[in-house]
Amino acid sequence: MKLIIGLGNPGKEYSGNRHNVGFQCLSRFAKENHISFDKKCCLSRTGSGRINDEEIVLAKPQTYMNLSGKAVNQLLRRYNLKATDIIVVQDDLDLPAGKLRLRLGGSAGGHNGVSSIITDIGTKEFIRLKIGIGKPDARNNGAEVVDHVLGNFGGEEREIIETAIARAAEALACLITSGLDTASNRFNC
């Protein structure tokens, strides 16, 4: 079984934010695989299904981003899974908008949702699918970063992200069916 967690903030006011590309990717992946988020469990909206022979659970934590680890920890215990059984779909400021990167482990890279997961489950050894959202303009002080991640995508940027979300959903399917090495070789750009 694989547990796929999309990171984001709950609520309609956040749905189009850069910080919510994890939720957006999971929504697309769920739709393509006829999975609905029809359950509430472990501080999350969840749905389950199968990809080939692999059972999967999709989860969108309903905590705010900075508390995502609480939901992930509960989900791991509920399904009796290890950190190596999870895939976290997240936004990444350090990647140009639309770029994807799959990797196992590593630091949180300044992402508070990932930091919360690492703290609450006690390890950083889980797979991440990072979707680039780019950095705010030149000066990179705290207020600009917050405004950037909580801002919505505009015009041309929105088109780039829609394409990236579609590719990220493909990457998830490839990751589940063919493994990290194959998916990384195909989708890391």
From Swiss-Prot:
Q: Which GO terms describe its cellular component?
A: cytoplasm
Q: Which reaction equation describes what this protein catalyses?
A: an N-acyl-L-alpha-aminoacyl-tRNA + H2O = an N-acyl-L-amino acid + a tRNA + H(+)
Q: What is its main location?
A: cytoplasm
Keyword set for this entry?
Cytoplasm, Hydrolase, RNA-binding, tRNA-binding
- EC number assigned by the record: 3.1.1.29
The record's disulfide annotation reads none
The secretion signal range is none
Active-site positions, per UniProt? 19 (proton acceptor)
| Family statement | Belongs to the PTH family.
Name of this chain's protein? Peptidyl-tRNA hydrolase
